[in-house]
UniProtKB/Swiss-Prot annotation:
GO terms for biological process: carbohydrate transport. It catalyses: sn-glycerol 3-phosphate(out) + ATP + H2O = sn-glycerol 3-phosphate(in) + ADP + phosphate + H(+). CDD domains: ABC_MalK_N. Its main location: membrane. The keyword ATP-binding applies. This is sn-glycerol-3-phosphate import ATP-binding protein UgpC.
Amino acid sequence: MSTLTLSNITKSYPNGYQAVHKLSLNIEDGEMVVLVGPSGCGKSTLLRMIAGLEEITSGKLKIDDCLVNNLEPSERDIAMVFQNYALYPHMSVYDNMAYGLRNRKTPKADIQRIVNDTAEMLEIDHLLERKPKELSGGQRQRVAMGRAIVRKPKIFLFDEPLSNLDAKLRVQMRLQIKKLQRRLATTSVYVTHDQVEAMTLADKLVVLNQGTVEQVGTPLEIYDNPASVFVATFIGSPAMNILDAKVTNKGLTLGSSLSPIDTQSLKPGDIKLGLRPEHINIVEKSPWFEVEVELIESLGADLLLYCKTLDCKEMDETDQNLVVRAEGHSKIEIGDILGLDIDQKHLHLFDADTSKHIEIDLKMNDQKELLYA
């Protein structure tokens, strides 16, 4: 088990494009760290630099206290699991898993014990004689994981390993990866663009955007306290609603609607209001504003109401849209006009220019009685 330290890591290409810019990160011994972000944010490039598959332009990469910038991949004691499995098609499952151990001249009896124990842990011990073409996608991924596990590396790297699996298999494999990582207690770095995958797997979540770190924290810390509009809208499904508002001498306004927030600690001007769908309450008489329901998605236990605001138009004179989560059996129909109230503990304000979170102590009037519990 090992620590991983990245100090001002930069990756630049000859054409001037900078995939990663002065990125610093500390990964503790036994920690599962998930790098999440949209395509092109630099997460896979960063993982490849850790593995030694990409050259680091500048900065320092240390495993424990050892600088590894110039070490070959084989010298770093790292195992990597890819999304395409990378299994040898002519070899059996057993031989695929044993391949690295044989190259390291591990005694035959030890190879047999290690492979059998790992296969049993992964629940693929009944597949050891099969070839990859005879396996399902989930089984192939478990073989790829087994091949990495038998090496007992200092660090595991996962590069979107579940991307090729269907939705049901992804859920199953997420659970298995999490259980395995806890059991093995091996330092792990996992790359994904799927924020649900990131939230469920991570001990520490690193949100990347355009080659830089937007925020680092536990999944709940990032969900409850996003540092920017980017993080707020990337983490969470459905995404956080972001509404344009203004701070005036009368208070916080959305168009011509005056909110019940005490804004004495805010500077006058434009501001962005962040509201998660599950933190919006439907009430008989709204202290905030009303919306019209334009679309309803039923998820069984919940309804997702896609709404447009009424009388909340901003400078461009267009309606603002937001999503509200309601109880699954609520009697709500398209075209209904609903009053909304906000759970003050979960209200977020962002600077209109920088999109960064504004830390203030919000004070509001009492919540109104809920119409739809």
